[in-house]
């Protein structure tokens, strides 16, 4: 049943090769905002959403027993219990890979350590701690299901899952807030950015639950979890569409030259393909259509399927919807990063006067964009903004 995960080592090897050929700040081939940044934002959102979705599913529908009532053999556990365990394991892997992208983008071990140890406390520090803690809690929740731990009690798991949900919300919102705090990028100052990232993470969590139905047999708890995930995701996708329209309205209606340039990039520039094709077409329109179709079809089949012990919804269609959601989530982050990160410096409004970098920023390798004085005269007007995720 788990043979479908056999491609995972090849994916890990491929990502490792990409990291090996990428420079220390995540910038490759002259691009001013590297692939590592987008990968980190995507994987952190997927992992956070998956942990939250699996925890909520267990708290509301599965109620997996622990302690003396635990089933020693994982293969003999109920399908819903295996579904939750699989989503938790996959989410933990996504968070770990995202943390690896974060470390690779920083480039040096001392910069990584400074995120956790060096004062002062910043949003970047808090986000790094949240990602690390969520990864640890997700790993503990997954291992408790795969391993035989007879002394573990259900009440302890409920507390851990509640904590995991709180940390997942922090991680989901953190990425958008981090972009919002970067000076000189007006597009990211919109409150629609963290809202979009948080909604996208929630949609990804629902997608992982729906995709996980491919790997387990259908029972009452699985049907409830999958049906609820599909219904919630329909609402989340509609909210995403509203937030996306709000971000576009903010960009198109702004009088600021930098925001207008970002709007041009989203409409028909470098960010247009991931925004319109991946996010809007796949992640919003197509995913919504497939999920609504599954819900309508499943409503008529639910009673007969429950009597027969079959799955209430076509799992292949749900897996397709999940894949579309994940493609849209990646496209959203790629488009927002591309539209906001590479605007000319002269178009961006200085949010604060230049200051000497703090010890924490200096240790983490934070550097401000090159000044016009260094870039040289009038030629600096056409230079692109040198921004990485760790710029301030």
How would you name each of these model-derived features?
Residues 41-43, 62-72, 79, 132, ...:
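Long, contiguous internal "core" modules enriched in hydrophobic/ aromatic residues
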Residues 11-37, 68-76, 103-125, 176-196, ...:
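Membrane-interface interhelical loops and short amphipathic "cap" helices
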Residues 46, 50-130, 134:
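Membrane helical hairpin/interfacial module
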Residues 4, 18-20, 303:
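Basic polycationic patches enriched in arginine
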Residues 2, 346-392:
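Low-complexity, proline/glycine-enriched hydrophobic segments characteristic of transmembrane helices
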Residues 7-8:
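Leucine-biased recognition of intrinsically disordered, low-complexity hydrophobic segments
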Residues 209-212, 337-345, 366-368:
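A cytosolic-side transmembrane-helix exit/cap motif
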Residues 1-3, 295:
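Hydrophobic alpha-helical membrane-insertion segments
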